[in-house]
């Protein structure tokens, strides 16, 4: 299974969307600053994740979530979660 996920950085108010085959490992990489794009983030919170059966489906979904309408979907999801407790 491939997981498409979204994280939020509170100080910058930025949303990052990615995909991985090991969400725990990937979140640890983000938090340790081992991801080129997210190493500038200081308060990373996972707020959305969904699994896809294969890489191709996951990549299509990732592209959608990075689109304008996908970003709006994620903003709605972000407002529905309590970021004080991570998923």
Predicted regions and their residues:
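GIY-YIG nuclease catalytic motif and its immediate N-terminal context
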Residues: 1-35, 42-66, 71, 76-87
């Amino acid at each position: 299974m491939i997981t498409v996920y979204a994280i939020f950085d509170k100080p910058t108010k930025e949303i990052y969307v990615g995909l991985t085959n090991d969400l725990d490992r990937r979140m640890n990489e983000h938090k340790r600053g081992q991801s080129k794009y997210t190493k500038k983030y200081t308060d990373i919170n996972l707020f959305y994740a969904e699994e896809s059966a294969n890489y191709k489906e996951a990549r299509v979904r990732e592209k959608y979530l990075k689109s304008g309408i996908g970003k709006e979907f994620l903003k709605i999801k972000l407002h529905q979660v309590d970021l004080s407790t991570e998923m």
